[in-house]
Every structure is written in C-alpha cells, then in structure tokens.
Amino acid sequence: MTKKLALKRRGKDSEPTNEVVASSEASENEEEEEDLLQAVKDPGEDSTDDEGIDQEYHSDSSEELQFESDEEGNYLGRKQSSSAEEDEESSDEEDNEEEGSTDEEEVEDEEKVSKSKQSDDKPSGSGAASKKALTAELPKRDSSKPEYQDSDTSDEEDIRNTVGNIPMHWYDEYKHIGYDWDAKKIIKPPQGDQIDEFLRKIEDPDFWRTVKDPLTGQDVRLTDEDIALIKRIVSGRIPNKDHEEYEPWIEWFTSEVEKMPIKNVPDHKRSFLPSVSEKKRVSRMVHALKMGWMKTTEEVEREKQAKRGPKFYMLWETDTSREHMRRIHDPVSAPKRDLPGHAESYNPPPEYLFDAKETKEWLKLKDEPHKRKLHFMPQKFKSLREVPAYSRYLRERFLRCLDLYLCPRAKRVKLNIDAEYLIPKLPSPRDLQPFPTVESMVYRGHTDLVRSVSVEPKGEYLVSGSDDKTVKIWEIATGRCIRTIETDEVVRCVAWCPNPKLSIIAVATGNRLLLVNPKVGDKVLVQKTDDLLAEAPSQDVIESERIKTAVQWSNAEADEQEKGVRVVITHFKPIRQVTWHGRGDYLATVMPEGANRSALIHQLSKRRSQIPFSKSKGLIQFVLFHPVKPCFFVATQHNIRIYDLVKQELVKKLLTNSKWISGMSIHPKGDNLLVSTYDKKMLWFDLDLSTKPYQTMRLHRNAVRSVAFHRRYPLFASGSDDQAVIVSHGMVYNDLLQNPLIVPLKKLQTHEKRDEFGVLDVNWHPVQPWVFSTGADSTIRLYT
C-alpha cells in the first residue's frame, strides 16, 4: 500500500516538469533497455536453466520493466512507463481519488496481488534489499485455444492448405488452390500478366529474393538467413554455419596396448585337456565302421547309382521344348510355307486350270520362273490313285533347306498404308490437250516388217524402211506413196536430215549407208542438194589405216543415181542405226558387231569419217547427238555414257539397271533423256539430278522397242511388242527446283501382231501433235 501511494505521489510531483525531463528520461530508458537486452542475450547471466519459470532481474532505475518469456526461454522487454504514460496514470489517479471508496478497494486488491506474486517469486535477499525487483512473467495460456496452436516445432508447421503432397498443377484450371482446415476453398491470389511481372521486376528491389509458395500461391520474401543457407548449399558446404566440420578427434578406444588388461582371467584346465564327449563320439564311429553299419561317401554314391539304373536321354530336344539359342540373340523363326490352295488339288475346279493363253505365258517365263504366279501347272485327275509321283519334290525340299539356312531373316513392321495415298495426284488428261487420241490414217504398201520411219523437217513428207528391201516416200496429208527406192538388202534404219536447207535421207541397208536425194518438195532445194553431193572435196588430212579399213566413201553408180542415191558409205559390218546432228552436217552410225569401231561419226561436207573410241566398253546399241551441247550419247546393253566431243573425255555414266537397252530419245532442251528397254520398262533420266533414273515407267506388257520426244509439245510416245503406242505428257519446267511432270495420257492399240513383234518404231510430226508408228503388220499408222 505504501509502495503504490509513493508511486502515485511521485507521478503527481513529476506532472509540471514532464516536458522538461522527457528527453533525459528517454535517453536513460534506452540505455536501460539495451543493458537489459544484453543481459537476456548473455546465457551466462541466466538465473535458472528451467524453461517456463518466472525469473527476476534487478535494476537501479525506479521505472518498472516487464519481460515476457516464450516456451523456449527467450525474453522480450516491454517498458512499463514513459513520460506520456505517467501523465495518463497521474490523471487517472486524480479521477480515482475523486471517486472515493471505489479507488481504495482497487488499491487493496492490487496490494494483495503484488503480495501473492512476491511470495511465489522468492527473489534473492541481497538483490531485493538494495534494488527494486523487476519481474518477468510468462503469459498464461488461454484455455479456449488449442494446445499446439503457437508451437514452433517443425512437426507442427502452420500448413493452411491440406491437399497433401500432390502436384499443384492439378489446380491450374480452378479458381482455388486447395482447402484449409475448415474444408473451405483457398482462393488463388490475383495473378498479374507479363506487364505486371515486368513492372515488379523493375520497381521491386526484393524481386530477386521473392519466390512463390506452391501451396498457397503467395509470394514469399527470402530472408538474409535463407539466402545465406541457399548459398552454402549451392557451394557444397554444410548448411549449418555453426557446425564445426573439423572437430578434434577423441580416441574413445585407444590403439595403445595398456599394461593392465581389462580381462585377466586364467584359462580353465578343460581348455587344454582332450574332450571326453569327442572321445566317446569317435569310439562310436570306429565301432560302426567295424560292424559295417557306417559307410563312406563313395559307397553311398555307388549304392544310389545301382538303384537308379542306366540313364537314357534324347539326342535332340523335342519339338515342344524351346531350343536354347546360344550365340544368337532374339532369333527369328523361319517363315511357314503357304497352305495349298484349290489349284494344287488333284481334281481342281475348271476355272483353276490353264487355258492355251495362260499355258503359253507360263512357258514363256521359263528363264524367269520367279515371275510366274504359280510355280507349277495345275492338272486334273479322275481319282487320287491316278496321281503320279511328284518329280520336283526333292528339288523343292532342297531349295527349302537352302532358304532356311542361307537366307537372312529380319523382322519388319508391317505398314498399313492406304492404296489411294500411294497414287500420285495427277492432272486430268482433258487439261493436257492437245495430244493424239484416234487413228487417222494407215499407210499401206510394204510387204514385210516396217522397221523405221522419219519425217521431213517441214512436216510434208514421210520416209519408211522395211524388210522388203524398199524405201518408200509418202505424202502425209494424202497417204500417197510418191517414190519407192529398192535396195539390195534389208533396210534397218532411215533418217531425214534435220536441216531444212537440205533434202537428204540417210538409209542404212546392210553394210552400206546411202545418202539419197528424195527429189520431193522445192526444186531449188533439190538442185542445191545435188550440187552439194556431186563432187567430193579435196582431202586435207591423211586418213589412218584403221579408218580406211572400217569405212569407205564413194559416189553412187549410174543405176543408183537414177533412184536418187548420191553417196555410198561402205562399212565393214552391218549397220543397225543412223542418226543426224542437229545442224545436218554430221551423222553417226552404229555397228554392234564392230567391237571398238562400233560407232562412227561422218562429216558430210568434207566426206571424212572418225572413230571416236579406241577401246570397247561393251556392245553399243544406240547413239545420239546432244541438241545444244557438243556431247555424244552412247548406249550399251546396260549403261549409257555421255562424252564431251571437244574435250574428248567421259562426262557422265548413267546406270539403267536394265538387261538390254533398245533405244533413246533426248528432250529438245537437252536436260532429260528417255530410254526404252527390252525388259518392258521406260526410264526417265534427269541429267542435272542424278545418274540413276528419275522415274521408271512400266506401262507396257512386252518389250519396248522405241521412244520419241516431240520437238515443240510436252509429249512423248513409246511403242512396244504388245501392239500399243502409249502417248504421255512430259512437262519439263524452267525452274530447276521443280521436278518434271509425267502423266500417261492415251493408249493407242491398232497394230496387229506378227511373229511376236508389234510396234517397231515411233516418230512425231515436227509441227503438229501427231505421232507415226510402224509395225510388224507392214503398215504405218498416223494418230492425231
């Protein structure tokens, strides 16, 4: 009571001087607070080690300070009075004095409480006598709150989101991010766009240390301690900086031998005496051996072997057991034979038996049995007992064994591809007109095979050569035969000079090449041609013996002069093909039997011949001149070689992958080549692209004899032994990045078949989209 009243009087006395002393009291309070906090932080000055027990601190100041302690013993200082608070307390006490008895009762209650606290705290006698005691009281726990609400332990973390350890991206499509302890949705915080994030990155200085909590979606700012911890972990150091990594080693068990052993008990007497139990066991075993009761291991094995008897095993494993494949990983089983069909029956239905045509085709593929649909010819018997022994049984078994152990096996994934997807999307033929569609005229007059045909450069006349040893000149518009020139041998090839200023036809008959003036067309042109071929020019160069023995130039005799023959070039072997250069001064001939002199080049103006090759690269079948460049195309049976006539070197070798080449035709621009083969194929070569075929066309059923490009229109035609002439669209673009467009247009099949031969030669009209074809039926047909 006295202490409380003294405090009140002191407050009243200090009222007039509050403003004057405020600054001095504030400085003194700050010094006292720092001293008290330093005393709290220093563990050596703690009055007790027990947590949760009220502790007392002493101070010389008359002001009262209270400290609150948490469960871990950390204290927080709280000032109880200041200059402003003292004014408020003094004013409150004056009001209380005016109230009277009510204030006195409250004072008495406060004295009782202070006495009870003093009796519980029990401060030290020496400190309490000299200084005023300052008590630090622990706050009482509210019974209405949970016991572990304010806990700081890691096991009781304040986790508001109760979804558990799940991927949080499951809540990306929802407005909430989980549920709290009351099963209420935790709404996601507002998310800014990229502009907001950019502004925060610029304006917020703590943006670099801000992370997002995936459980709550809130931005959490990392403290300096967290950043220091992260740096230590990243650098590979121990996270706790207070941990001493290199503490002094304490040898709990020393390596030095001590003088006094821990255990020094002397050995027992039985440790060095023979064991009595072992002695008894050995004596029993000796007695059993003497009596024959006990047997050795070898005797036991011999008795077991006698009981088992002889052991039999199979030389090979059974078919049901899986063979252990050594040295082979992931073995592939052999493919099974196809089950027999109705055609293999001894009495098959009539529709499975071959007719005369099918039998002929089956026998025709004798050299290529793998192309047959059936490897046998179905037969019909009345009964099973009439079926003879199968003569090819051993051969088929032998081939099957060869396939099983010689052919490599591999697993392939079967692709289910729609057939329509593989068919290229081609334009409609109606959009690609004009092209020949019907047969317009038939030129009849030859009595044997018509092997070759050629058209005048202006497109008015037509020349043909036949096996009936005649050369006929036709008028295209009327179909009238204007002139017939008889020869001594079969006419293999005819070629009209492409130069419109000359009227010359080259005729290959036997060993001779005849240069004929057809005497049709302009008379001035005919006379100019006769003047050119009348006299031989002087020879400036001496020809070698190799050329003289291969070819000889001479003027035609009188009887041949009347027929129109002007010059005769005699070769040492039969001529198969003749072709002109684009300018009309050079022409080349092919003699397949001539070995390294199979191809010859003749110059008309100088009446001189050349042998371009000194070595034989194979049997030459066909030659061509490039329409623009000084290049020479030479086709052997399997390959095509392109030579530069100026540099006299090989430029390129085209690989046809065919058995036998029959003919060639080059595009007017000179960048694409069309090749026909006897194995039913046509090959399109893009000379700028590759040495392999750009496209292989199998449009015919039999051997393809001839192919030809049109000079003006994007058309080409092919003739085959299946009596068909197929007209196709072949557009070559100026853009090198765009591939040629090839579209089959029309199949013209009007020729008749004679002795397995059909169409022998095709040629285009130089101006109109018309095509001429010669056949084994001794006719020439025009399609327009």
Curated annotation (Swiss-Prot):
Where are the compositionally biased (Acidic residues) regions?
A: 27-36, 45-54, 62-73, 84-111, 149-158
Span list, region Disordered: 1-159
Which keywords appear in this protein's UniProt record, sorted alphabetically? Nucleus, Repeat, Ribosome biogenesis, rRNA processing, WD repeat
Here the segments flagged for biased composition (Basic and acidic residues) are 112-123, 138-148
Q: Where is the major localization of this protein? A: nucleus
Question: Gene3D superfamilies, alphabetically?
Answer: YVTN repeat-like/Quinoprotein amine dehydrogenase
Q: Does the keyword Nucleus apply?
A: yes
Q: Which InterPro entries match?
A: BOP1/Erb1, BOP1_N_dom, WD40/YVTN_repeat-like_dom_sf, WD40_repeat_CS, WD40_repeat_dom_sf, WD40_rpt
What does the record list as GO biological process? maturation of 5.8S rRNA from tricistronic rRNA transcript (SSU-rRNA, 5.8S rRNA, LSU-rRNA); maturation of LSU-rRNA from tricistronic rRNA transcript (SSU-rRNA, 5.8S rRNA, LSU-rRNA); regulation of hemocyte proliferation
Recorded GO MF terms: ribonucleoprotein complex binding
Basic residues compositional bias: what residue ranges?
A: 1-11
| A single Gene Ontology CC term | preribosome, large subunit precursor
Q: What's this protein's family per the entry?
A: Belongs to the WD repeat BOP1/ERB1 family.
Give the function comment from the record. Answer: Required for maturation of ribosomal RNAs and formation of the large ribosomal subunit.
Q: What is this protein identified as?
A: Ribosome biogenesis protein BOP1 homolog
Instruction: Give the species.
Output: Drosophila sechellia
What phylogenetic lineage does the species belong to?
Eukaryota, Metazoa, Ecdysozoa, Arthropoda, Hexapoda
